[in-house]
Protein backbone atom coordinates (compact mmCIF):
# COMPACT_ATOMS: atom_id res chain seq x y z
CA UNK A 1 0.00 0.00 0.00
CA UNK A 2 2.67 2.45 -1.12
CA UNK A 3 2.29 5.93 -2.57
CA UNK A 4 4.71 8.27 -4.36
CA UNK A 5 4.60 11.08 -6.91
CA UNK A 6 6.45 9.58 -9.88
CA UNK A 7 3.56 10.17 -12.30
CA UNK A 8 1.83 13.49 -12.92
CA UNK A 9 -1.48 13.70 -11.03
CA UNK A 10 -1.09 10.08 -9.89
CA UNK A 11 0.37 9.20 -6.45
CA UNK A 12 2.15 6.02 -7.52
CA UNK A 13 5.77 4.88 -7.65
CA UNK A 14 7.39 3.55 -10.80
CA UNK A 15 7.93 -0.09 -9.89
CA UNK A 16 7.48 -3.73 -10.80
CA UNK A 17 6.34 -6.49 -8.48
CA UNK A 18 7.14 -10.18 -8.94
CA UNK A 19 5.04 -12.50 -6.79
CA UNK A 20 5.50 -16.27 -6.41
CA UNK A 21 3.98 -18.72 -3.91
CA UNK A 22 7.14 -18.34 -1.82
CA UNK A 23 8.29 -14.75 -2.21
CA UNK A 24 7.47 -11.25 -3.40
CA UNK A 25 10.02 -8.89 -4.93
CA UNK A 26 9.41 -5.16 -5.41
CA UNK A 27 11.66 -3.60 -8.04
CA UNK A 28 11.90 0.07 -7.14
CA UNK A 29 14.35 2.92 -6.58
CA UNK A 30 15.38 1.77 -3.10
CA UNK A 31 16.91 5.13 -2.20
CA UNK A 32 13.42 6.62 -2.17
CA UNK A 33 11.86 4.02 0.12
CA UNK A 34 11.63 5.34 3.67
CA UNK A 35 12.98 3.17 6.52
CA UNK A 36 9.43 2.85 7.87
CA UNK A 37 8.08 1.64 4.54
CA UNK A 38 10.99 -0.76 4.06
CA UNK A 39 10.47 -2.26 7.52
CA UNK A 40 6.74 -2.69 6.87
CA UNK A 41 7.39 -4.36 3.52
CA UNK A 42 9.99 -6.72 4.93
CA UNK A 43 7.70 -7.62 7.82
CA UNK A 44 5.15 -8.70 5.23
CA UNK A 45 7.63 -10.81 3.28
CA UNK A 46 8.42 -8.33 0.50
CA UNK A 47 12.03 -8.09 -0.68
CA UNK A 48 13.30 -4.90 -2.33
CA UNK A 49 15.39 -4.92 -5.51
CA UNK A 50 16.67 -2.19 -7.80
CA UNK A 51 14.18 -1.02 -10.42
CA UNK A 52 16.62 -1.60 -13.29
CA UNK A 53 17.37 -5.19 -12.25
CA UNK A 54 13.99 -6.57 -13.32
CA UNK A 55 15.21 -7.86 -16.70
CA UNK A 56 18.28 -9.61 -15.27
CA UNK A 57 16.31 -11.23 -12.46
CA UNK A 58 13.62 -12.55 -14.79
CA UNK A 59 16.21 -13.84 -17.26
CA UNK A 60 18.06 -15.66 -14.45
CA UNK A 61 15.00 -17.56 -13.14
CA UNK A 62 15.68 -21.30 -13.43
CA UNK A 63 12.79 -22.77 -11.46
CA UNK A 64 10.07 -24.04 -13.83
CA UNK A 65 6.93 -22.00 -13.24
CA UNK A 66 3.95 -20.39 -14.93
CA UNK A 67 4.00 -16.60 -14.89
CA UNK A 68 0.86 -14.51 -15.32
CA UNK A 69 1.54 -11.34 -17.29
CA UNK A 70 -0.81 -9.25 -19.40
CA UNK A 71 0.89 -8.46 -22.71
CA UNK A 72 -1.35 -5.43 -23.28
CA UNK A 73 -0.11 -3.68 -20.14
CA UNK A 74 3.27 -5.15 -19.12
CA UNK A 75 6.41 -3.44 -20.39
CA UNK A 76 7.32 -5.11 -23.70
CA UNK A 77 10.96 -5.69 -22.74
CA UNK A 78 9.86 -7.49 -19.57
CA UNK A 79 7.36 -9.59 -21.51
CA UNK A 80 10.04 -10.57 -24.03
CA UNK A 81 12.41 -11.70 -21.27
CA UNK A 82 9.65 -13.83 -19.75
CA UNK A 83 8.85 -15.43 -23.11
CA UNK A 84 12.52 -16.10 -23.90
CA UNK A 85 13.26 -17.82 -20.58
CA UNK A 86 12.76 -21.59 -21.17
CA UNK A 87 12.00 -22.14 -17.48
CA UNK A 88 8.97 -19.87 -17.63
CA UNK A 89 5.57 -20.52 -19.17
CA UNK A 90 3.81 -17.21 -19.74
CA UNK A 91 0.06 -17.03 -19.24
CA UNK A 92 -1.24 -13.92 -20.97
CA UNK A 93 -4.24 -12.87 -18.87
CA UNK A 94 -5.75 -9.87 -17.14
CA UNK A 95 -4.27 -8.73 -13.85
CA UNK A 96 -6.53 -10.21 -11.13
CA UNK A 97 -5.66 -7.35 -8.79
CA UNK A 98 -7.73 -4.93 -10.89
CA UNK A 99 -10.93 -6.81 -10.14
CA UNK A 100 -10.02 -6.96 -6.46
CA UNK A 101 -9.29 -3.22 -6.28
CA UNK A 102 -12.50 -2.49 -8.18
CA UNK A 103 -14.56 -3.67 -5.19
CA UNK A 104 -13.84 -1.23 -2.37
CA UNK A 105 -13.85 -2.45 1.24
CA UNK A 106 -15.77 -0.75 4.03
CA UNK A 107 -12.76 1.23 5.28
CA UNK A 108 -12.07 2.60 1.80
CA UNK A 109 -15.73 3.48 1.30
CA UNK A 110 -15.87 5.35 4.61
CA UNK A 111 -12.78 7.38 3.72
CA UNK A 112 -14.08 8.08 0.21
CA UNK A 113 -17.29 9.53 1.64
CA UNK A 114 -15.30 11.79 3.94
CA UNK A 115 -13.00 13.08 1.20
CA UNK A 116 -15.95 13.69 -1.12
CA UNK A 117 -17.56 15.86 1.55
CA UNK A 118 -14.43 18.00 1.82
CA UNK A 119 -14.13 18.11 -1.96
CA UNK A 120 -17.74 19.26 -2.17
CA UNK A 121 -16.94 22.14 0.19
CA UNK A 122 -14.17 23.23 -2.19
CA UNK A 123 -16.58 23.00 -5.13
CA UNK A 124 -19.19 25.14 -3.38
CA UNK A 125 -16.62 27.77 -2.42
CA UNK A 126 -15.40 27.78 -6.01
CA UNK A 127 -18.92 28.34 -7.32
CA UNK A 128 -19.58 31.18 -4.88
CA UNK A 129 -16.37 32.99 -5.84
CA UNK A 130 -17.03 32.43 -9.54
CA UNK A 131 -20.57 33.83 -9.31
CA UNK A 132 -19.51 36.82 -7.21
CA UNK A 133 -16.63 37.82 -9.47
CA UNK A 134 -18.73 37.46 -12.62
CA UNK A 135 -21.52 39.50 -11.04
CA UNK A 136 -18.98 42.22 -10.21
CA UNK A 137 -18.09 42.47 -13.89
CA UNK A 138 -14.63 40.97 -13.58
CA UNK A 139 -13.12 39.40 -16.70
CA UNK A 140 -12.52 35.71 -16.03
CA UNK A 141 -11.15 32.98 -18.27
CA UNK A 142 -11.02 29.20 -18.28
CA UNK A 143 -7.60 29.52 -16.65
CA UNK A 144 -9.15 31.50 -13.78
CA UNK A 145 -11.49 28.58 -13.11
CA UNK A 146 -8.51 26.25 -12.72
CA UNK A 147 -6.79 28.70 -10.35
CA UNK A 148 -9.85 29.12 -8.10
CA UNK A 149 -10.43 25.37 -7.86
CA UNK A 150 -6.80 24.71 -6.97
CA UNK A 151 -6.89 27.42 -4.30
CA UNK A 152 -9.78 25.82 -2.43
CA UNK A 153 -8.77 22.20 -2.87
CA UNK A 154 -5.13 22.71 -1.93
CA UNK A 155 -6.18 24.56 1.23
CA UNK A 156 -7.30 21.21 2.66
CA UNK A 157 -4.59 19.67 4.83
CA UNK A 158 -5.18 16.22 3.31
CA UNK A 159 -4.78 17.44 -0.28
CA UNK A 160 -2.03 15.74 -2.29
CA UNK A 161 -2.50 16.67 -5.94
CA UNK A 162 -5.13 17.23 -8.61
CA UNK A 163 -6.25 13.82 -9.84
CA UNK A 164 -5.99 15.05 -13.44
CA UNK A 165 -5.57 18.32 -15.28
CA UNK A 166 -8.70 20.41 -14.72
CA UNK A 167 -10.97 20.64 -17.74
CA UNK A 168 -12.55 24.10 -17.62
CA UNK A 169 -14.33 24.51 -20.95
CA UNK A 170 -16.59 27.39 -21.89
CA UNK A 171 -19.18 27.19 -24.66
CA UNK A 172 -18.10 25.21 -27.69
CA UNK A 173 -14.83 24.16 -26.05
CA UNK A 174 -16.83 21.75 -23.89
CA UNK A 175 -17.58 19.66 -26.97
CA UNK A 176 -13.88 18.71 -27.25
CA UNK A 177 -13.05 15.57 -25.28
CA UNK A 178 -10.42 16.23 -22.60
CA UNK A 179 -10.03 19.84 -23.65
CA UNK A 180 -7.33 21.71 -21.76
CA UNK A 181 -7.01 25.49 -21.67
CA UNK A 182 -3.52 26.95 -22.05
CA UNK A 183 -2.12 30.48 -21.63
CA UNK A 184 -1.90 30.65 -25.42
CA UNK A 185 -5.34 29.21 -26.17
CA UNK A 186 -8.28 29.74 -23.81
CA UNK A 187 -11.73 31.30 -23.74
CA UNK A 188 -13.04 34.31 -21.82
CA UNK A 189 -16.18 33.56 -19.79
CA UNK A 190 -19.29 35.44 -20.85
CA UNK A 191 -22.65 35.98 -19.15
CA UNK A 192 -24.37 33.42 -21.36
CA UNK A 193 -24.11 29.74 -22.22
CA UNK A 194 -22.52 26.93 -20.26
CA UNK A 195 -19.25 26.42 -18.42
CA UNK A 196 -18.20 22.77 -18.12
CA UNK A 197 -15.89 21.95 -15.22
CA UNK A 198 -14.45 18.44 -15.00
CA UNK A 199 -12.00 18.25 -12.12
CA UNK A 200 -10.87 16.26 -9.13
CA UNK A 201 -8.22 15.77 -6.50
CA UNK A 202 -6.39 13.09 -4.60
CA UNK A 203 -6.39 13.42 -0.83
CA UNK A 204 -4.79 11.28 1.84
CA UNK A 205 -8.07 9.41 2.15
CA UNK A 206 -9.46 9.22 -1.38
CA UNK A 207 -9.59 10.36 -4.98
CA UNK A 208 -12.38 12.39 -6.58
CA UNK A 209 -13.56 13.15 -10.11
CA UNK A 210 -16.56 15.43 -10.46
CA UNK A 211 -18.11 17.08 -13.52
CA UNK A 212 -20.52 20.00 -13.29
CA UNK A 213 -22.10 22.25 -15.91
CA UNK A 214 -22.79 25.84 -14.86
CA UNK A 215 -25.16 28.20 -16.71
CA UNK A 216 -23.42 31.58 -16.76
CA UNK A 217 -26.42 33.55 -17.97
CA UNK A 218 -28.93 33.44 -20.78
CA UNK A 219 -29.45 30.00 -22.37
CA UNK A 220 -30.91 29.02 -25.71
CA UNK A 221 -33.89 26.68 -25.87
CA UNK A 222 -31.65 23.90 -27.23
CA UNK A 223 -29.22 24.34 -24.34
CA UNK A 224 -32.07 24.03 -21.84
CA UNK A 225 -33.40 20.90 -23.53
CA UNK A 226 -30.05 19.14 -23.84
CA UNK A 227 -29.15 19.98 -20.24
CA UNK A 228 -32.51 18.66 -19.00
CA UNK A 229 -32.32 15.44 -21.00
CA UNK A 230 -28.76 14.79 -19.83
CA UNK A 231 -29.86 15.39 -16.24
CA UNK A 232 -32.59 12.79 -16.77
CA UNK A 233 -29.87 10.35 -17.85
CA UNK A 234 -28.06 10.88 -14.55
CA UNK A 235 -31.27 10.48 -12.56
CA UNK A 236 -32.06 7.21 -14.33
CA UNK A 237 -28.64 5.71 -13.63
CA UNK A 238 -28.79 6.85 -9.99
CA UNK A 239 -32.17 5.14 -9.55
CA UNK A 240 -31.27 1.98 -11.49
CA UNK A 241 -31.75 -1.42 -9.87
CA UNK A 242 -29.82 -4.29 -11.44
CA UNK A 243 -29.45 -8.04 -11.06
CA UNK A 244 -26.21 -9.88 -10.39
CA UNK A 245 -25.56 -10.63 -14.07
CA UNK A 246 -25.78 -6.96 -15.09
CA UNK A 247 -22.65 -5.62 -16.74
CA UNK A 248 -21.33 -2.12 -17.37
CA UNK A 249 -22.68 -1.67 -20.88
CA UNK A 250 -26.19 -2.64 -19.73
CA UNK A 251 -26.17 0.20 -17.20
CA UNK A 252 -24.73 2.53 -19.82
CA UNK A 253 -27.73 1.77 -22.02
CA UNK A 254 -30.13 2.60 -19.19
CA UNK A 255 -28.42 5.96 -18.73
CA UNK A 256 -28.67 6.98 -22.38
CA UNK A 257 -32.35 6.19 -22.91
CA UNK A 258 -33.68 9.74 -22.20
CA UNK A 259 -31.44 11.09 -24.98
CA UNK A 260 -32.01 8.19 -27.37
CA UNK A 261 -35.72 8.92 -27.08
CA UNK A 262 -34.94 12.15 -28.97
CA UNK A 263 -32.54 10.41 -31.41
CA UNK A 264 -29.43 12.04 -29.94
CA UNK A 265 -26.52 10.75 -27.89
CA UNK A 266 -23.42 11.81 -25.98
CA UNK A 267 -20.12 10.57 -27.40
CA UNK A 268 -18.28 10.08 -24.11
CA UNK A 269 -18.70 7.33 -21.52
CA UNK A 270 -21.34 7.59 -18.84
CA UNK A 271 -18.86 7.09 -16.02
CA UNK A 272 -15.92 5.09 -14.71
CA UNK A 273 -14.52 3.70 -11.51
CA UNK A 274 -12.04 5.74 -9.47
CA UNK A 275 -9.20 4.29 -7.42
CA UNK A 276 -8.54 4.79 -3.72
CA UNK A 277 -5.76 7.39 -3.54
CA UNK A 278 -4.51 6.50 -7.00
CA UNK A 279 -5.49 6.59 -10.66
CA UNK A 280 -8.55 8.68 -11.42
CA UNK A 281 -9.42 6.02 -14.02
CA UNK A 282 -9.23 2.54 -12.53
CA UNK A 283 -10.43 -0.61 -14.25
CA UNK A 284 -12.04 -2.87 -14.82
CA UNK A 285 -15.36 -1.02 -14.46
CA UNK A 286 -16.41 1.74 -16.84
CA UNK A 287 -19.90 2.64 -18.01
CA UNK A 288 -19.71 2.68 -21.78
CA UNK A 289 -21.04 0.70 -24.71
CA UNK A 290 -18.10 -1.72 -24.84
CA UNK A 291 -17.37 -2.79 -21.27
CA UNK A 292 -18.81 -6.18 -20.31
CA UNK A 293 -17.38 -6.28 -16.77
CA UNK A 294 -20.02 -7.48 -14.32
CA UNK A 295 -21.18 -4.98 -11.73
CA UNK A 296 -20.53 -5.77 -8.08
CA UNK A 297 -22.01 -4.14 -4.97
Predicted regions and their residues:
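Active-site neighborhoods and metal-handling regions in enzymes and metal-associated proteins
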Residues: 1-297
Amino acid sequence: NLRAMDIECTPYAMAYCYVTPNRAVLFIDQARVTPEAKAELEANGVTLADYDSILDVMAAETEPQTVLAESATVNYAVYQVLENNPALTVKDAADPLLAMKGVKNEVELAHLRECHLRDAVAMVRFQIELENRLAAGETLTELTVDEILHKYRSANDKFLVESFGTIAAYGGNAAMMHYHATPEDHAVLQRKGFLLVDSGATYMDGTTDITRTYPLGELTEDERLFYTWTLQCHIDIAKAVWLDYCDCHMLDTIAREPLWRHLINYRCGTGHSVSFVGNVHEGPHALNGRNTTLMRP
